[in-house]
């Protein structure tokens, strides 16, 4: 879905920065509950047009409890405590990722599992992932006026059941290019069948907890059952709550299940032609939740359906990825992208994200010259700076302040604002390294800065993970001039490596970067992506000049240590998520335990069917 500028089923086989970065923020207004579901009317799978002959794998057959009328594995064995939590999203790192959504669904679930919860993540199978096994379970799902067959693939890693929905609309489009073409053939261009693709995801996700017999977890056996919390993520999963209320709960299925809806980026909403609503196969009572009118002419002019709007209204709880972003979303049309009034009614809770501290660890990083921790950072970062200067082809001198920019080259991240500020910095004794890929116009823009200032600026416009790690270790300041930033990961990675950030004062950057302690704030930049505001250029340049003057001083060294002495892991955010989800009151839910995550390279992660 291009960013905004301002079932039926048949189954067969305001200060800048806050001290407590992990504390959630709830913004509740009038307690609006959305549309009320119909009262459950008893029934079973047959009234859903569901017939079952799901075939278990040989390993599953050895451990299945027989005797269930509906499914051979319907009995849930739980020797652990906690909740049954099912995350659903279009991305799941490291298997698929274009941004923060993939990182969250890759990192938060293992932290939840470490606390004793049974956790599943469901996402499309965009590639032939070598560690995902065919469960031999298939489902025929109705989309529009036809049935489409999907298969369920599975792997169990880091305490989490990873489930992949296999269908040609996912695999054929993206195969081999997972990071580039999940949503469309080119940046900003959508596949025409995205509604069908993600309707399949939503409906298949509702079947998975009931029919997949998963026995890898030493504490849980069998299916997840029906007492689950679904955590939907962004517009691609907007209809899931409606399908739950339309297809299951009136038939006595998932009576106690609840849905939390998490907004990762309000700019992508899933807006489609109003005439497409019947293709969702939902009753008329849900039409108003999707109904939307805006002033844009894409995909059609005037009246539309809006998947994110429906996800917000039909969910039992609405969340987003940082407290300050939650405040911005309800502040007005510009930052709420015309859904601000809806969120003021439903209320919204902000929980800041964590990061993968095992992948980004300067004490063990194989890509950097000198490994270090908070006690050795100052000298080690100087050595890494020299290595970075040599790698980039810049004059090697550890005394020259080095500013870095790493990010997707699109309007949100402000590469055009950064480029416009570079000439204002050239009178300073400074070096600048730019790394990113994205829209061609921005790639050309950054390369033009290198051509104009060859002795001071280097631009690398291709994916280069080793260089990204070396930049984090060698840069003195990380520039993050985002027009808006729901949470942001880049600043967490920078601070993990002891690199203070000079950032715009928006979203999660406000919650995670503290002025004068772990970084420098530029103030809020304009969200108008069509122009580069001169006032924004001045803010970026002035803040970077201020940061340059601090580099090399005792105050700067204290900032480096402050950055590295933080706990930026998922541990705190996972506990906050637990508290919110427990509040939904799903039957059998209980608080978790204090546990440690399974390491990525642990023997428990060996793939097995």
From Swiss-Prot:
Biased composition (Polar residues): 46-66
Main subcellular location: plastid
EC assignment: 2.4.1.242
One annotated GO biological process: starch biosynthetic process
Compartments where found: Plastid, Chloroplast; Plastid, Amyloplast
Gene Ontology molecular function, alphabetical: ADP binding; alpha-1,4-glucan glucosyltransferase (UDP-glucose donor) activity; IgE binding
Keywords, alphabetical: Amyloplast, Chloroplast, Glycosyltransferase, Plastid, Starch biosynthesis, Transferase, Transit peptide
Role: Required for the synthesis of amylose in endosperm.
UniProt name for this protein: Granule-bound starch synthase 1, chloroplastic/amyloplastic
Gene: WAXY
């Amino acid at each position: 879905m291009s960013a905004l500028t301002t079932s039926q089923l048949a189954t067969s086989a305001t200060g800048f920065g806050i001290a407590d970065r992990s504390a959630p923020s709830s913004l509740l207004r009038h307690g609006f509950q959305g549309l009320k579901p119909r009262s459950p009317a008893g029934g079973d799978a047959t009234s859903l047009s569901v017939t079952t002959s799901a075939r278990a794998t040989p390993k599953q057959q050895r451990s299945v409890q027989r005797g269930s009328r509906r499914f051979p594995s319907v009995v849930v064995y739980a020797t652990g405590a906690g909740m049954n939590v099912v995350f659903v999203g279009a991305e799941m790192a490291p298997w698929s990722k274009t941004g923060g959504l993939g990182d969250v669904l890759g990192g938060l679930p293992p932290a939840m599992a470490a606390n004793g919860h049974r956790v599943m993540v469901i996402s499309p199978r965009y590639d032939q992932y070598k560690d995902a096994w065919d469960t031999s379970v298939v489902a025929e799902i109705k989309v529009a006026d036809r049935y489409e067959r999907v298969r369920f693939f599975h792997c169990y890693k880091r305490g989490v059941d990873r489930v992949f929905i296999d269908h040609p609309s996912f695999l054929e489009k993206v195969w081999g290019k997972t990071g580039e073409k999940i949503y469309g053939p080119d940046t900003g261009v959508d596949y025409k069948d995205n509604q069908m693709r993600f309707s399949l995801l939503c409906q298949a996700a509702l079947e998975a907890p009931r029919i997949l017999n998963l026995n890898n977890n030493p504490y849980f056996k069998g299916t997840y059952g029906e007492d689950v919390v679904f955590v939907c993520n962004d517009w691609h999963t907007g209809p899931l709550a409606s399908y739950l209320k339309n297809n299951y709960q009136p038939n006595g299925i998932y009576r106690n299940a609840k849905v939390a809806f998490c907004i990762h980026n309000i700019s992508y909403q899933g807006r489609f032609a109003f005439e497409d609503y019947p293709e969702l196969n939902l009753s008329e009572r849900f039409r108003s939740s999707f109904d939307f009118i805006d002033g844009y002419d894409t995909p059609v002019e005037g009246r539309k359906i809006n998947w994110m709007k429906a996800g917000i209204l039909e969910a039992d709880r609405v969340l987003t990825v940082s407290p300050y972003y939650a405040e911005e979303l309800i502040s007005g049309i510009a930052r709420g992208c015309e859904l601000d009034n809806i969120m003021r009614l439903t209320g919204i809770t902000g929980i800041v994200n964590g990061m993968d501290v095992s992948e980004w660890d300067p004490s063990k990083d194989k890509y950097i010259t000198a490994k270090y921790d908070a006690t050795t950072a100052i000298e080690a970062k100087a050595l890494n700076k020299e290595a970075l200067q040599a790698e980039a082809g810049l004059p090697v001198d550890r005394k020259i302040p080095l500013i870095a920019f790493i990010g997707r080259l699109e309007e949100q991240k402000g590469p055009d604002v950064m480029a416009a500020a570079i000439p204002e910095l050239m009178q300073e004794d400074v070096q600048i390294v730019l790394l990113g890929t994205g829209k061609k116009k921005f790639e050309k823009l950054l390369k033009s800065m290198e051509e104009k200032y060859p002795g001071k600026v280097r631009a690398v416009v291709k994916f280069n993970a080793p260089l990204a790690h070396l930049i984090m270790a060698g840069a003195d300041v990380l520039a993050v001039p985002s027009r808006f930033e729901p949470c942001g990961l880049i600043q967490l990675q920078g601070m993990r490596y002891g690199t203070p950030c000079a950032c715009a004062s928006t979203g999660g950057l406000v919650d995670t970067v503290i002025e004068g302690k772990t970084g420098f704030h530029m103030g809020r930049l304009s969200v108008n992506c069509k122009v580069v505001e001169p006032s924004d250029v001045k803010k970026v340049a002035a803040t970077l000049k201020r940061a340059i003057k601090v580099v090399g001083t005792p105050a700067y060294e204290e900032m480096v240590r402050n950055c590295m002495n933080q706990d930026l892991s998922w541990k705190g955010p996972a506990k906050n998520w637990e508290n919110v989800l427990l509040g939904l009151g799903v039957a059998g839910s209980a608080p978790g335990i204090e546990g440690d995550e399974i390491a990525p390279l642990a023997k428990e992660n060996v793939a097995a069917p």
